[in-house]
């Protein structure tokens, strides 16, 4: 087990949401919610890192491998956006990365999905 308590993950949704437009026109939103949560958790003396797959330009497989390599006690998929419905369009990317992670690690890393979509539709999110 890693010494890392929590890994906050922004999954790579830009390609799924914007397709080829993402090559030239899609902005990368800073992981504001991850940074706020990280600060709170570090105040509780937990070790925390942020993996911003959007900024790293990772695909789902690369993101899942990076999470597996870090082997946190808890992997938190932070699926938010500044626009209220933004988390819904990013959910498929989060699901793809989660599924790849579970296939690599055989479900050994505990995961949590958070965001407005997951909060509003928890059962559908789990399906």
Model segments located where?
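Short glycine-rich His-centered loop
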Residues: 4-26
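Nucleotide donor/acceptor-binding cores
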Residues: 2-4, 73
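Intrinsic structural disorder
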Residues: 1, 12, 41-43
């Amino acid at each position: 087990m890693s010494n890392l308590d929590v890994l906050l993950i922004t999954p790579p949704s830009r390609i799924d949401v914007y397709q080829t437009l993402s090559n030239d026109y899609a902005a990368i939103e800073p992981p504001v919610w991850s940074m706020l949560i990280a600060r709170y958790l570090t105040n509780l003396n937990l070790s925390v890192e942020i993996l911003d797959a959007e900024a790293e330009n990772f695909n789902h497989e690369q993101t899942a491998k990076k999470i597996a390599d870090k082997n946190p006690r808890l992997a938190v998929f932070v699926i938010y956006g500044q626009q209220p419905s933004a988390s819904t369009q990013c959910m498929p990317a989060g699901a793809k990365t989660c599924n790849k992670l579970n296939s690599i690690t055989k479900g050994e890393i505990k995961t949590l999905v958070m965001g407005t979509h997951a909060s509003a539709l928890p059962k559908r999110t789990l399906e």
